[in-house]
């Protein structure tokens, strides 16, 4: 699988990860516009790989609450997939726990159910940090991506190893 990640080529700081400029994503309008561009690019690239017979399992798109609230994400995703000739097994969607906080939670949950019905894989990214709750395991999630803070150096950290095993056993 491939994951569509966004990086900013800053003129003085070089390549900057999205995590280092979260204030951009606090503006829902800007976040939604960026989300549309990233989704379109990722799906276009996946279609090109299919056309060129490049083997890949799926491309995963990280989405924000703004994508669901302002972009009608499930409907737009279905339309773009059809336009690019992509099947549900070619596309994954990644969400984080922050999307389920506040007044956008209902829109996000409804949208996730729609995406799940389409047959696209839904992953819960960075699970185990922040406000993650066992209640999140009841969401229409196909895959948990345990946060790297638990898996980095796991072979030397029995506590983190036990936590990861417990999550996997769930």
What residue spans do the PLM features occupy?
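Catalytic core of bacterial c-di-GMP phosphodiesterases, primarily the EAL and HD-GYP domains
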Residues: 2-3, 30-107
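Conserved long alpha-helical elements within nucleotide-processing catalytic cores of c-di-GMP signaling
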Residues: 19-26, 32, 109-113, 161
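Conserved, mostly hydrophobic/aromatic
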Residues: 21, 38, 61, 93, ...
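Catalytic-site-adjacent helices and loops of nucleotide signaling machinery
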Residues: 14-18, 27, 124-136
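A short, well-structured catalytic beta-strand-centered motif of the EAL phosphodiesterase domain
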Residues: 1-23, 42, 142-144
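Glycine-enriched alpha-helix->loop->beta-strand junction motifs that scaffold or abut catalytic
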Residues: 86, 116-120, 139-146
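Bacterial c-di-GMP phosphodiesterase catalytic domain signature
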Residues: 8-10, 67-79, 99-110, 127-170
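Surface-exposed amphipathic alpha-helices with a cationic face
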Residues: 46-50, 81-82, 109-119, 165-169
């Amino acid at each position: 699988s491939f994951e569509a990640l966004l990086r900013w080529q800053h003129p003085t700081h070089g390549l900057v990860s999205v995590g280092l400029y979260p204030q951009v994503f606090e503006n829902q309008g800007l976040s939604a516009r960026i989300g549309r561009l990233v989704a379109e690019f990722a799906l276009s690239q996946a279609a090109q790989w299919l056309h060129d017979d490049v083997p890949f399992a799926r491309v995963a798109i990280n989405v924000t609450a703004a994508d669901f609230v302002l972009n009608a994400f499930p409907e737009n995703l279905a339309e773009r997939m059809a336009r690019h000739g992509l099947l549900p097994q070619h596309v994954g969607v990644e969400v984080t726990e922050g999307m389920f906080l506040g007044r956008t939670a209902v829109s996000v949950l409804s949208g996730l159910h729609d995406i799940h019905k389409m047959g696209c894989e839904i992953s819960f990214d960075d699970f185990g940090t922040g406000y993650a709750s066992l209640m999140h395991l009841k969401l229409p999630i196909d895959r948990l991506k345990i946060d790297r803070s638990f898996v980095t150096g796991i072979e030397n950290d029995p506590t983190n190893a036990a936590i990861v095993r417990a999550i996997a056993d769930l």
